[in-house]
Amino acid sequence: SFIKHSLSYDMPSEISYLVNTIIESTKELIKTINDFDIDTYINDLIISEYNKQKSQLILEEFKHEMINNFLPHMNDTPNQLKGFYIMSLLRKFIYCIYYTSRYPDRDSMVCHRVLTYGKYFEILAHDELENYIGNIRTDIINNHKNRGTYSVNIHVLTTPGFNHAFSGLLSGKFKKTDGSYRTHSHYSWMQNISIPRSVGYYPDQVKISKMFSVRKYHPSQYAYFCPSDVPERGPQVGLVSQLSVLTSITNICTNEYLELEKKICNYIRSYNHNDISYFETGYYITLENSLIACLNPNLVDDFVIDFRRKKRMNYFGNLEIGITLVNDHMNEIRINIGGGRLIRPFLVIDNGNLIMDEIFSELEFKIDDMTFSDIQKEFPHVIEIVDIEQFTFSNVCESVQKFRALPKSEKCKYHLCDFPAEFKDGYVASSLVGINHNSGPRAILGCAQRKQAISCLSSDIRNKIDNGIHLIYPERPIVISKALETSKIAVNCFGQHVTIALMSYKGINQEDGIIIKKQFVERGGLDIITAKKHQVEIPLENFNNKERVKSTAYSKLESNGLVRLNAFLESGDAIARNISSRTLEDDFVQDNQISFDISDRYTDMYQSRVERVQVDLTDKVKVRVLTMKERRPVLGDKFTSRTSQKGTVAYIADETELPYDENGIKPDVIINSTSIFSRKTVSMLIEVILTSAYEVSPYNNDGQNRPICFPSSNETSIDTYLDFAKRCHRDRYPSLSDDDINDKMFCDTILYDPETDKPYSSKIFMGPIYYLRLRHLTQDKATVRCRGKKTKLIRQANEGRRRGGGIKFGEMERDCLIAHGAANTITEVLKDSEEDYQDVYVCENCGDITAQIQGNKVCIRCSKQNLSTILTKVDTTHVAKVFITQMNARGVKVKLEFEKRNPLFYKPLDVVDLSPNFL
């Protein structure tokens, strides 16, 4: 009756029927066993498992291990509590059979812990330490049995696992099958922040399986993960996401964990013994899934409220504890203190009152001089740190504005209130503007482009020999958000303010093409500097070889064999001396030693200045050279706004070719106006309007600089921003009419044609905006060549720009030439220019390519059968011959056949009629 009442209490009626069925079937099972005894039954199960595992332990040791290690997370717990825990699991299992959607599924983040680098290192180190101690123990026992000595072999003392753990910690590369922080190369300052906050969920098996549901945005990720900064394509879609701005990951040491566990257990056991022993109809209290007590249902709400208050007051010495009240027939209080949990702060609602509103006057007076930790100490009940499980089972109001508008009866239903919507985005998404005013895909594309934006200079750019691209004259953005300001991303700038105009320019700026002003480029507009590392390893004998070689590549080297500082390297120049010498085995040659240059060359299309040279002398000479190059915008370079309005330079126009306004101001960049409508980026227009408003009123009433807050996600209407801009222009130009003020507010400007000096018939949208330059540079991607290196096997051009390869001329390009009838060009491109042609002899009997034996062409297949062969010479490419040979080696016969017809000189000549045709 106890089991029946415990499993069916506060459950739907259909579950009660199933519980009765389970109990009755168990009774019937017991009746079938003669003289049933529970101890004997369990003992038989252990013996059966012992025989199944073929354990090397004796039976008593195996039995002791099985019983003691049952439910290992409750190892020190009495067996009675273990039994109650099994009943709680059975209760949840039965409930989830009927109501599968009520409890977190496999893909819910409630069921996941993020494995950070430190935690992974700790797991590897613990496992290796256990193996290390176990190996030493086993070796001592074996040596004592065999030789009677207590010695340890030297190979047992090696620690390859520790070496693997430390190398993984330093390199950030553990096994790919575990979800953990991800690492990438850093191209900009933004990636230093965004990449460590990128979390992967699932192992590699998910990427190749047909599991599409796990790639969807799971509801449990709301408020803790950025919904915008996700991969838009590739195998990582839906499997990797960024933490939101306020989200962090818990971390706790073992000694802190044990101390905190002891404090919480003492607090729970401070309740009356009868109130925490309701194992039949009470609420189970678990601490990290370990059953502690079962609480009186009448005390549940008061217990949770009191526990949360004590937690906020730091009674337990830890503010990151998660306490979750699971109602809905589950009847469980879950307390979590472990590491790897996702946590973030929320505003506290107590009995229908927002605590922040009650102490607002006192908090507002001190807020300028307080940090987040100070608020938690002085006003502990304002903010609560909540983990993702507590958030899932709590009633959370999405904004303060919505909560204040609710009636009192509705307010009492909520436990927590969220911060403004911009803090649900990640750091990358928070650098965008007005995501909620644009179409959905713009946010995802904007995050991807924002990571590619070139940021400001590093502090040690000249001494750090590494690849990097840096903006020379960065500017702090005027339109920012709270997240952008507090994270210091705004201070570490990533773009410049430029004047743009939305118009068509002679049909040049079609699609993504933009027009950029030549004088803007010459004055350093969006100018960058490229730092590039060139590293070579040279054998010591080659580096010290003083033999002279006829090579113009050594013109920039000094006498020590290294490139000169401040030398300008061009394509083909050597980085360092590398001369290989070889002795010819020929007694008739007086000078039988030849030397040739095998040095690594500088391969970039543009000249670069040598900034630093480092040399490491070991068994090989390791030379590292840092080169610098100023890179002004050129045709094909890529730019974008913060609303994912990307564009490439289609034309660099002189200012005499550009239109101008009544003040003579000319746009720095001209963008295709139709891109706004096709991509639906309304927030780009709002950003221009707000930046223009800052231009006329950059200071507040106290005379201090006043950036404009236009966050990535917000609940403010567009009319509010337009009214703000209108007031700024009205204060600056009080005498203008409403129409003129509206023109200035909406950045509608009359531009004049530079050729006729007459105004255009319609007004042009022109104003300032924060513009970004991306790391996709034309000169870094040009791979056209007409001659160069070839591969040894197939004698075709190398693949890849770094290896001196060119653009592949493939099937589609060939089809274009066929359409033009350019037969000779096809022959030259596909056969003569880049490949080695080869004459081969083919046997007309079997179609095999002949072999050359002692200078004679022989068909091996026909010669073994003593057949007479007819060999035909075929002019083909070397790669075709290699392909046929490899197919034959794999057991695939490729037969070359010829058209059966007589040669042309055997054809009878046409009869020529010599009679005169005028008769």
Swiss-Prot record:
Q: Where in the cell is it found?
A: Virion
Which Gene Ontology CC terms are recorded? DNA-directed RNA polymerase complex; virion component
Q: Which GO terms describe its molecular function?
A: DNA binding; DNA-directed RNA polymerase activity; metal ion binding; ribonucleoside binding
> What's the Enzyme Commission number for this chain?
2.7.7.6
Family under the similarity heading:
Belongs to the RNA polymerase beta chain family.
Record's subunit section: The DNA-dependent RNA polymerase used for intermediate and late genes expression consists of eight subunits (147) kDa, (133) kDa, (35) kDa, (30) kDa, (22) kDa, (19) kDa, (18) kDa and (7) kDa totalling more than 500 kDa in mass. The same holoenzyme, with the addition of the transcription-specificity factor RAP94, is used for early gene expression.
Q: Which PANTHER family match?
A: DNA-DIRECTED RNA POLYMERASE I SUBUNIT 2
Q: Which GO terms describe its biological process?
A: DNA-templated transcription
Q: Check the record and name the InterPro entries matching this protein.
A: DNA-dir_RNA_pol_su2 (IPR015712), DNA-dir_RNAP_su2_dom (IPR007120), DNA-dir_RNAP_su2_hyb_sf (IPR037033), RNA_pol_132_poxvirus (IPR024390), RNA_pol_bsu_CS (IPR007121), RNA_pol_Rpb2_3 (IPR007645), RNA_pol_Rpb2_5 (IPR007647), RNA_pol_Rpb2_7 (IPR007641)
- Enzyme class, one word? transferase
Q: What is this protein called?
A: DNA-directed RNA polymerase 132 kDa polypeptide
Q: Name one Pfam family in it.
A: RNA_pol_Rpb2_6
Query: Could you tell me the keywords of this UniProt record?
Result: DNA-directed RNA polymerase, Metal-binding, Nucleotidyltransferase, Transcription, Transferase, Virion
Instruction: List the catalysed reactions.
Output: RNA(n) + a ribonucleoside 5'-triphosphate = RNA(n+1) + diphosphate
Q: What does this protein do?
A: Part of the DNA-dependent RNA polymerase which catalyzes the transcription of viral DNA into RNA using the four ribonucleoside triphosphates as substrates. Responsible for the transcription of early, intermediate and late genes. DNA-dependent RNA polymerase associates with the early transcription factor (ETF), itself composed of D6 and A7, thereby allowing the early genes transcription. Late transcription, and probably also intermediate transcription, require newly synthesized RNA polymerase.
